[in-house]
Amino acid sequence: MSCLVLPLVSVGNIPQLSIDWLLNSQANEWEYLEALDSKYLVEFVGPLDRPEDGSDSLYKDADMKYSSALEVFYNKKRGLFAIQQRTPLVSVNYLNNFIVEIILPFLSKYNISEICIWDSLYAMEDENGVIVRPQEVYSLGEFYFDDEAELLSNLHLNDQESMVNNWLHFTPTSFQDKISVDQPIFKILFQILNASQRPKALRSIKYCSCLANEGDNSLDSQQFLQWIISQKVIKNAPPIVKFVRPISWQGAYGMADARDKFVDLYN
């Protein structure tokens, strides 16, 4: 069984930061696999990143000098693929093209059986009322392809509920119980479920999301990853003994926790 982790560019870049934690904290298990076509993304070229603690580079066996906007890393030991998307789409209107032309062929090429999508949302932007437990921070929704009849019926949207749907089955402790057509996850699911040549090996889709605000979300992303691992969302994902940042975070993310320094300000 192989799984692809796909982070969405969303609030606070939490999914991307969580991928950074995952890769750099277990750098001995991950390696650079390939760069995907980034024609629908904002252009990006940067230096090759590496773990801050001096561990082996993720690019150690790759003959390259620069990193690009859309790269795939592979954990052969655990059958895991992880995409790191470093820039957003040029326009949200290209999301459908991105899924159909870039992601679906990748799923087929490597016979991916499960895709795990990571996302982050603003709690205050819930026009369609999908957030039903705002006291919770995380959500986990799942879709399985076991029943083709159920799949076909799920593609039909009730006219009275056209702004939301229940394609995903959320856990009882999730902050949301449906998805909105305004969410990128809706378009992603729609394109995968309606694909004329759906990847044959694909058996399940999992959607992990968290509520957040913009800022230095390095701690939020670490806790998000910890939650994903604790829930065994990705069955083969091992616990992280020591969290390691990438060197690219220096001066940008991951400042020491300064919350205690503001105590006197509010007393």
Swiss-Prot record:
Keyword Kinase: no
Gene Ontology biological process terms, A to Z: proteasome assembly
Gene3D superfamilies (alphabetical): PAC-like subunit (3.40.50.10900)
Subunit structure: Component of the 20S proteasome chaperone. Forms a heterodimer with PBA1 that binds to proteasome precursors.
Record has Chaperone as a keyword: yes
InterPro entries in UniProt: Proteasome_assmbl_chaperone_2, Proteasome_assmbl_chp_2_euk, PSMG2_sf
Subcellular location: Cytoplasm
Main location: cytoplasm
GO cellular component, one term: cytosol
Protein name: Proteasome assembly chaperone 2
Swiss-Prot/TrEMBL keywords: Chaperone, Cytoplasm
Extra remark: Present with 2940 molecules/cell in log phase SD medium. Deletion induces the unfolded protein response (UPR).
The organism's place on the tree of life at top rank: Eukaryota
Function description: Involved in 20S proteasome assembly. Required for maximal proteasome activity. Affects the chymotrypsin-like activity of the proteasome. Can be degraded by the proteasome. Involved in the endoplasmic reticulum-associated degradation (ERAD).
Family as reported in the entry's similarity comment: Belongs to the PSMG2 family.
